[in-house]
């Protein structure tokens, strides 16, 4: 049997870029998700979502998956840990990287993880989660801190916080060149707060 060699999981590096947004309501959450869904590099990326209970992580994921083309009811993976999805893409939105050559050009595989109740490191191996993270497609994880040390470096980290007006303050950090490409494309469609753009430019000048 051929063995699969996975990248060594190391500590999180310094961000390559960062930006922040304010979602005043769910409509703006949906608009942000639609802008993110248009980034081709997202189709083979790993995204972490951080935030307290009720911050809106699962709501955002539902908007993102619908924007990517997932149809039907989108269940939360809280009890199952992971929910797989398939999105049908038009040929112009086919995954751009050679590593996705084995996938149908019109099907995007998506795995939505929720590690809130995860407490057994052995399950990570036995359930095949490591293989899923090494597979082509989009991986999204809520409560990644519950599986810290077992997960790869995230391309994007989105921290969602409830603000005083019941909107959402969102900070996005990128930790890989792929994540930076996604962020740069996202900023063209969904301008960030002015102070975060300055922080982003400062972070990406090196």
Question: How would you label these PLM feature ranges?
Answer:
Residues 2-14, 19, 119-125, 130-206:
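Short phosphate-coordinating micro-motif centered on Lys-Gly-acidic
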Residues 38-44:
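Phosphate-binding P-loop
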Residues 47-49:
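Hydrophobic anchor at the beta1->P-loop junction of P-loop NTPases
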Residues 52:
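P-loop (Walker A) phosphate-binding loop of NTP-binding proteins
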Residues 57:
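Conserved lysine of the Walker
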Residues 70-85:
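Short beta-strand-centered segment that lines the nucleotide-binding/catalytic pocket of NTP-utilizing
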Residues 94-107, 202:
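Intrinsic disorder/low-complexity segments
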């Amino acid at each position: 049997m051929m063995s699969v060699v996975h990248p060594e999981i190391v500590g999180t590096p310094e961000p390559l870029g960062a930006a922040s947004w304010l979602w005043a309501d769910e409509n703006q959450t949906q608009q942000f998700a639609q802008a993110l869904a248009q980034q081709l590099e997202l189709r083979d990326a790993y995204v972490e979502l951080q935030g307290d209970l009720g911050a809106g992580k699962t709501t955002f994921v539902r908007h993102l998956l619908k924007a990517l083309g997932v149809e039907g009811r989108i269940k939360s993976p809280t009890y199952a840990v992971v929910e797989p999805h398939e999105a049908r893409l038009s040929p112009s939105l086919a995954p751009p990287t050679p590593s996705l050559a084995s996938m149908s050009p019109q099907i995007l595989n998506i795995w939505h993880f929720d590690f809130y109740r995860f407490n057994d490191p052995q399950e990570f191996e036995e359930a095949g989660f490591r293989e899923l993270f090494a597979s082509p497609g989009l991986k999204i994880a809520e409560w990644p801190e519950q599986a810290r040390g077992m997960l790869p470096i995230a391309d994007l980290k989105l921290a969602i916080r409830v603000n005083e007006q019941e909107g959402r303050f969102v900070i996005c950090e990128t930790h890989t060149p792929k994540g930076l490409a996604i962020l740069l494309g996202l900023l063209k469609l969904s301008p960030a707060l002015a102070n975060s753009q300055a922080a982003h430019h400062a972070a990406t000048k090196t």
